[in-house]
Structures are given as structure tokens and as C-alpha cells.
Curated annotation (Swiss-Prot):
GO biological process: cytokinin biosynthetic process
Lineage, uppermost ranks: Bacteria, Pseudomonadati, Pseudomonadota, Alphaproteobacteria, Hyphomicrobiales
Keyword Transferase found: yes
Species assigned in the record: Agrobacterium vitis (Rhizobium vitis)
EC numbers: 2.5.1.27
UniProt name for this protein: Adenylate dimethylallyltransferase
Disulfide bonds: none
């Protein structure tokens, strides 16, 4: 079975690469993103819209309400193995994402060492200026999407249920928006009415939070196997 793995830090274009590859191959894309398993966080987690998918198929490891929390890495890994098994007859899958913990689970599991032909695309972290430009563009789109609720609208809706707030504080984007509101002594719903200057500061802050996370991803991702080449067989990751 062919597995095409696309991974790298946030805001480096993995989803676009996966969609383009899905168009070329006709294979479905399975998201290796634990936060994207919560549809209530669709915009803030970077779930592509139906239009952005361009007729391709995108699968998720779970479909759960936020009240259940973010799926644990070990459970997500079990779901990943099950989905790969389910699609074995289709001849292949595209795996795309940047969950450090899930990729580490893959690296530590012997399951991936046999019976697969690997095609790996590793997106690297660019310099800070290039990254921030891309991250700010992404945040602007999240704050004013063409379709669906904005990141702030998702936050405001979920904020109304106090038991969800600790979960939101653990998620990039939502966490900074909550901090920004607190620092400026406003309620989350007032984030929907910011002037251009304040919105610019919010965008910059969220992008900076993404940069911090991207640097952590770049540092903690398991390394690609030294034996990696197009269509190689064996473990996809090396020792770390």
C-alpha cells in the first residue's frame, strides 16, 4: 500500500500540497491534526472548506464535540491505523498534518515499518519574515472567512459554556484571542468590533503564537528515515 506523508510546521502550506496531490492521484487525504477532529473549531483549526477541497476527499480521525476534549495522541494513532486498514483496498492514502504527539506515536510504533511504500514530503520552517507574512495572511482569512464562522465567532459561541474555556486556552489562536481580550479588558464578543489598529495587533499576536508553535514543531518532529527515497519500504522515521 502506498502512503504519501506530508508533514511540517503550521502555516507552511501542507494542506494545499495535500489537496494538489489528491487532485493528481485521486487519493483521499487523512488529516493528522487532532484539533481538526472538532468541527466546532473548523476555522480556527484550519479545516479546509468544501470549495478549498476542490472536489477531493478529506478524512478526519474523529468527529467530536469540544466538550469531549481534544482526542489524545494514542487514541488518534489507533484511529489512524484503523483508517489506513480500511483504505488498504483503495491502494493508497495521503496523510497530512503536523501533530507532534501523533507523529511521535507513529515513530515509536512498529506498525509502520512493513507493508507500506512511503512517499514523504517534509515542509520546512522558513525564516521568520517569510513565516510571519504567511501566518498573518492565514489569520486574516480566519478572522474574515468567505464561508462559515470566523475564529472569533467560534470562540464567542464556545465561550458561553464555561466548562469549554480551559480547553480553548490550550489551543493556538483561541488562546491568544482570549489573552488579548483579557489584556484589553474587553469580553470576547467585543473582539468582533475591533478597529483596524486593534485588529492588526490581534492578527500579529496570533501569528506570533503560531511562530512559537512552528518552532517547537520543527524542533520536536521525529526525523525522516535516513533510508528515505521515493517509494521506499521500512520505517518512515529514524531514531530520535
Amino acid at each position: 500500500m502506498d502512503l504519501r506523508l506530508i508533514f511540517g510546521p503550521t502555516c507552511t502550506g501542507k494542506t494545499s500540497t495535500a489537496i494538489a496531490l489528491a487532485q493528481q492521484t485521486g487519493l483521499p487525504v487523512l488529516s493528522l491534526d487532532r484539533v481538526q477532529c472538532c468541527p466546532q473549531l473548523s476555522t480556527g483549526s484550519g479545516r479546509p472548506t468544501v470549495e478549498e477541497l476542490k472536489g477531493t476527499t478529506r478524512l478526519y480521525l474523529d468527529d467530536r464535540p469540544l466538550v469531549k476534549g481534544i482526542i489524545a495522541a494514542e487514541q488518534a494513532h489507533e484511529r489512524l491505523i484503523a483508517e489506513v486498514y480500511n483504505y488498504e483496498a483503495h491502494g493508497g492514502l495521503i496523510l497530512e498534518g503536523g501533530s507532534i504527539s501523533l507523529l511521535k506515536c507513529m515513530a515509536q510504533s512498529g506498525y509502520w515499518s512493513a507493508d507500506f511504500r512511503w512517499h514523504i514530503i517534509r515542509h520546512k520552517l522558513a525564516d521568520e519574515e517569510t513565516f510571519m507574512k504567511a501566518a498573518k495572511a492565514r489569520v486574516k482569512q480566519m478572522l474574515c472567512p468567505a464561508i462559515g464562522p470566523s475564529l472569533i465567532q467560534e470562540l464567542v459561541y464556545l465561550w458561553n459554556e464555561p466548562r469549554l474555556r480551559p480547553i480553548l486556552k490550550e489551543i493556538d489562536g483561541y488562546r491568544y484571542a482570549m489573552l488579548f481580550a483579557s489584556q484589553n479588558r474587553i469580553t470576547p464578543d467585543m473582539l468582533l468590533q475591533l478597529d483596524a489598529d486593534m485588529e492588526g495587533k490581534l492578527i500579529h499576536g496570533i501569528a506570533q503564537e503560531y511562530l512559537i508553535h512552528a518552532r517547537r514543531q520543527e524542533h520536536e518532529f521525529p526525523p525522516v528515515s535516513a533510508a528515505a527515497f521515493e517509494g521506499f519500504e521500512g520505517p518512515p522515521f529514524g531514531a530520535y
